[in-house]
Amino acid sequence: MEPATLITIFLSCFLVGVTGYALYTAFGQPSKELRDPFEEHED
């Protein structure tokens, strides 16, 4: 395979992985540990 193809595949997998991790952190199990600054400072 050409180096450009391998780099493209690697970058694509990396971006999909980062996006998946961000979605898991935002909506998965770890989201229960996230703090909400708006709820902390209700007036």
Swiss-Prot record:
Pfam families from the UniProt entry: PsbN
Lipid bilayer topology: Single-pass membrane protein
Subcellular location: Plastid, Chloroplast thylakoid membrane
Keywords: Chloroplast, Membrane, Plastid, Thylakoid, Transmembrane, Transmembrane helix
GO biological process: photosynthesis
Cellular component terms (Gene Ontology): chloroplast thylakoid membrane
Main location: plastid
Transmembrane segments: 7-27
Cited InterPro entries: PSII_PsbN
Family: Belongs to the PsbN family.
Summary of the function given for this chain in its UniProt record: May play a role in photosystem I and II biogenesis.
Name this polypeptide is given: Protein PsbN
Species: Klebsormidium bilatum (Filamentous green alga)
